[in-house]
Swiss-Prot record:
Belongs to the oligoribonuclease family. Gene3D superfamilies: Ribonuclease H-like superfamily/Ribonuclease H. Keywords: Cytoplasm, Exonuclease, Hydrolase, Nuclease. InterPro entries: Exonuclease_RNaseT/DNA_pol3, Oligoribonuclease, RNaseH-like_sf, RNaseH_sf. It is found in: Cytoplasm. Residues 7-170 form the Exonuclease domain. Its EC number is 3.1.15.-. SUPFAM superfamilies: Ribonuclease H-like (SSF53098). This is Oligoribonuclease. GO terms for biological process: DNA metabolic process.
Length: 180
Protein backbone atom coordinates (compact mmCIF):
# COMPACT_ATOMS: atom_id res chain seq x y z
CA UNK A 1 0.00 0.00 0.00
CA UNK A 2 2.90 2.33 -0.65
CA UNK A 3 1.86 5.77 -1.79
CA UNK A 4 4.32 8.64 -2.33
CA UNK A 5 1.63 11.10 -1.15
CA UNK A 6 1.35 9.51 2.29
CA UNK A 7 2.80 11.43 5.21
CA UNK A 8 5.06 10.05 7.94
CA UNK A 9 4.48 11.52 11.38
CA UNK A 10 7.07 10.88 14.07
CA UNK A 11 7.67 11.87 17.65
CA UNK A 12 10.63 11.17 19.88
CA UNK A 13 10.98 11.48 23.60
CA UNK A 14 14.52 12.19 24.70
CA UNK A 15 16.52 12.52 27.91
CA UNK A 16 17.12 16.19 27.08
CA UNK A 17 17.50 18.63 24.20
CA UNK A 18 21.14 18.12 23.15
CA UNK A 19 21.61 15.36 20.56
CA UNK A 20 25.32 15.17 21.40
CA UNK A 21 24.79 14.33 25.07
CA UNK A 22 21.17 13.15 25.30
CA UNK A 23 19.48 10.08 23.80
CA UNK A 24 16.17 8.94 22.36
CA UNK A 25 14.14 6.97 24.90
CA UNK A 26 10.85 6.53 23.04
CA UNK A 27 9.65 6.77 19.46
CA UNK A 28 6.42 6.32 17.58
CA UNK A 29 5.19 6.84 14.03
CA UNK A 30 1.88 7.24 12.27
CA UNK A 31 1.26 7.25 8.53
CA UNK A 32 -1.59 9.38 7.18
CA UNK A 33 -2.85 10.01 3.71
CA UNK A 34 -2.55 13.52 2.28
CA UNK A 35 -5.91 14.43 3.86
CA UNK A 36 -4.59 13.57 7.36
CA UNK A 37 -6.59 10.37 7.72
CA UNK A 38 -4.65 7.82 9.75
CA UNK A 39 -3.71 4.79 7.67
CA UNK A 40 -1.53 2.96 10.19
CA UNK A 41 0.17 3.38 13.54
CA UNK A 42 3.72 2.12 13.69
CA UNK A 43 5.46 0.50 16.61
CA UNK A 44 5.62 2.49 19.84
CA UNK A 45 9.06 1.71 21.17
CA UNK A 46 10.66 2.40 24.53
CA UNK A 47 14.41 2.15 23.95
CA UNK A 48 16.53 0.59 26.66
CA UNK A 49 19.16 2.73 28.38
CA UNK A 50 21.07 2.18 31.57
CA UNK A 51 20.24 3.80 34.90
CA UNK A 52 23.47 5.76 34.46
CA UNK A 53 22.12 7.37 31.28
CA UNK A 54 18.70 8.02 32.84
CA UNK A 55 20.33 9.61 35.90
CA UNK A 56 21.73 12.37 33.66
CA UNK A 57 18.24 13.69 32.88
CA UNK A 58 17.45 17.14 34.23
CA UNK A 59 14.66 17.71 36.75
CA UNK A 60 11.95 18.35 34.13
CA UNK A 61 12.69 15.17 32.16
CA UNK A 62 13.10 13.09 35.31
CA UNK A 63 9.71 14.26 36.61
CA UNK A 64 7.85 14.14 33.29
CA UNK A 65 9.10 10.75 32.10
CA UNK A 66 8.86 9.32 35.61
CA UNK A 67 5.25 10.44 36.05
CA UNK A 68 4.21 9.09 32.63
CA UNK A 69 5.77 5.69 33.32
CA UNK A 70 8.20 6.09 30.42
CA UNK A 71 11.32 5.88 32.58
CA UNK A 72 10.22 2.49 33.91
CA UNK A 73 9.36 1.28 30.41
CA UNK A 74 12.86 2.31 29.26
CA UNK A 75 14.45 0.38 32.13
CA UNK A 76 12.39 -2.73 31.31
CA UNK A 77 12.82 -2.52 27.53
CA UNK A 78 15.08 -4.95 25.69
CA UNK A 79 15.05 -2.89 22.47
CA UNK A 80 18.27 -1.16 21.41
CA UNK A 81 18.48 2.06 19.42
CA UNK A 82 19.46 0.08 16.29
CA UNK A 83 16.55 -2.35 16.73
CA UNK A 84 14.09 0.52 17.19
CA UNK A 85 15.36 2.16 14.02
CA UNK A 86 15.09 -1.10 12.04
CA UNK A 87 11.55 -1.82 13.28
CA UNK A 88 10.43 1.69 12.37
CA UNK A 89 11.95 1.59 8.88
CA UNK A 90 10.37 -1.84 8.25
CA UNK A 91 6.98 -0.36 9.15
CA UNK A 92 7.45 2.74 6.97
CA UNK A 93 8.53 0.70 3.94
CA UNK A 94 5.01 -0.74 3.80
CA UNK A 95 3.42 2.69 3.40
CA UNK A 96 5.74 5.29 1.88
CA UNK A 97 8.63 4.98 -0.59
CA UNK A 98 11.97 6.15 0.78
CA UNK A 99 12.66 9.85 0.25
CA UNK A 100 9.07 10.84 -0.51
CA UNK A 101 7.48 12.02 2.74
CA UNK A 102 8.61 15.09 4.60
CA UNK A 103 9.19 14.48 8.29
CA UNK A 104 5.93 15.56 9.97
CA UNK A 105 5.23 16.64 13.53
CA UNK A 106 5.54 19.46 16.05
CA UNK A 107 8.93 21.17 16.47
CA UNK A 108 10.10 18.45 14.14
CA UNK A 109 13.52 20.01 13.58
CA UNK A 110 14.48 18.87 17.08
CA UNK A 111 13.46 15.27 16.32
CA UNK A 112 15.35 15.44 13.04
CA UNK A 113 18.52 16.57 14.87
CA UNK A 114 18.31 13.50 17.11
CA UNK A 115 17.62 11.19 14.18
CA UNK A 116 20.61 12.60 12.30
CA UNK A 117 22.84 11.98 15.31
CA UNK A 118 21.47 8.63 16.51
CA UNK A 119 19.45 7.01 13.68
CA UNK A 120 20.93 8.17 10.40
CA UNK A 121 19.20 5.45 8.35
CA UNK A 122 15.78 6.55 9.56
CA UNK A 123 16.62 10.23 9.08
CA UNK A 124 17.61 9.41 5.49
CA UNK A 125 14.25 7.71 4.91
CA UNK A 126 12.53 11.11 4.94
CA UNK A 127 12.48 13.73 2.21
CA UNK A 128 14.66 16.71 3.11
CA UNK A 129 11.58 18.89 3.67
CA UNK A 130 9.78 19.30 7.00
CA UNK A 131 6.07 19.59 7.69
CA UNK A 132 6.19 21.33 11.05
CA UNK A 133 2.85 22.06 12.71
CA UNK A 134 4.57 24.46 15.10
CA UNK A 135 5.11 26.84 12.16
CA UNK A 136 1.34 27.27 11.86
CA UNK A 137 1.05 27.59 15.64
CA UNK A 138 3.59 30.44 15.61
CA UNK A 139 1.82 32.18 12.72
CA UNK A 140 -1.58 31.77 14.37
CA UNK A 141 -0.18 33.23 17.60
CA UNK A 142 0.71 36.38 15.67
CA UNK A 143 -2.12 36.62 13.13
CA UNK A 144 -5.05 34.80 14.73
CA UNK A 145 -4.44 34.15 18.44
CA UNK A 146 -8.03 33.01 18.96
CA UNK A 147 -7.44 30.19 16.46
CA UNK A 148 -4.29 29.09 18.27
CA UNK A 149 -5.94 29.35 21.68
CA UNK A 150 -8.97 27.32 20.60
CA UNK A 151 -6.85 24.16 20.24
CA UNK A 152 -5.86 22.51 23.51
CA UNK A 153 -3.29 19.74 23.78
CA UNK A 154 -3.08 17.13 26.52
CA UNK A 155 0.72 17.23 26.71
CA UNK A 156 1.29 13.71 28.03
CA UNK A 157 4.80 13.69 26.55
CA UNK A 158 4.30 10.16 25.28
CA UNK A 159 5.30 9.77 21.64
CA UNK A 160 2.10 8.28 20.20
CA UNK A 161 -0.16 10.73 22.06
CA UNK A 162 1.98 13.63 20.86
CA UNK A 163 1.69 12.51 17.22
CA UNK A 164 -2.07 12.14 17.45
CA UNK A 165 -2.27 15.65 18.89
CA UNK A 166 -0.04 17.05 16.14
CA UNK A 167 -2.28 15.58 13.44
CA UNK A 168 -5.39 16.91 15.21
CA UNK A 169 -3.73 20.30 15.55
CA UNK A 170 -2.93 20.45 11.83
CA UNK A 171 -6.56 19.51 11.05
CA UNK A 172 -7.61 22.37 13.34
CA UNK A 173 -5.41 24.87 11.50
CA UNK A 174 -6.59 23.56 8.11
CA UNK A 175 -10.21 24.13 9.15
CA UNK A 176 -9.86 27.44 11.00
CA UNK A 177 -6.71 29.17 9.73
CA UNK A 178 -5.71 28.12 6.22
CA UNK A 179 -7.96 29.62 3.57
CA UNK A 180 -8.39 27.77 0.27
Amino acid sequence: MQNPQNLIWIDLEMTGLDPDSDVIIEMATIVTDSELNTLAEGPVIAIHHSDEVLARMDEWNTRTHGNSGLTQRVRESKVSMAEAEAQTIAFLEQWVPKGKSPICGNSICQDRRFLYRHMRGLENYFHYRNLDVSTLKELAARWAPDVRDSFKKGSTHLALDDIRESIAELRHYREHFIKF
